[in-house]
Amino acid sequence: MRRIAAFRQISVVAWTFGAVVAGLTLAMCWTIGSTVASAQSPGDRAQLAREMSAVPVSLAQGLVASRSEGTPISAKFELEDGKLQLSVYTDKDGRFAEVIVDHKSGKVAKAEAITDADDLSHAKAQSEAMAKAKRSLDAAASVAMKQNKDYRVVSVMPALKGGHPVAEVTLVKGKDWKTVSEKLD
C-alpha cells in the first residue's frame, strides 16, 4: 500500500515538473517568436515594409555572409535608430555574436560579441534549438518564401516546440505581414 502511495506521489511530482517545463518552454517560444512583431509599433512596421521593398540583399544572403563569423542561429531585418539593418546572431564555439550585414552589398559590416543579458538569453535559446535542427535557417526561409509568392522574409527565429526545433519565419508583402512555422528536424 505504501509503495502505491509513494509511486502516486512520484508520478504527481514528475507530471507537475513536466507541466512546468512545458509551460516555460511554450512561454519562451512565444516570446522569441513574437520578438519582431511586438518590438515594433505599427508605424515602425510600415517603415520597415517600405524600406524592405527596395533592399537588394535577401535575408538568406545575409545568413550566408554571416557564416564567416559562426553558425547563424537567427536573423532579422530591423530598424535601429530609424535606419534599416540586417542583424544575424551567430554561435561560434559557444560564443555568441551579432553580425550586421550591409543590406545593400551583402557583406559583413561588423560583428560584436553579445553581452546584453536579454540578447544573450535569446541567443542561448536559439542555439539550443539549432543544435537539434537538421535543416538550416536559410533552408526554412527558402521554403517559406516559395510557399508565399511575392513575400520577402523579414526574420527567421528558431525555437523549440514540444522538444522539436522550428523556425518562425516572418514575411511581408506590401502592408501584409504573416508569420509561418517551418520544421527544422
Feature roles, as predicted:
Residues 2-185:
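Long, terminal "pre-/pro-" and other extracytoplasmic accessory regions
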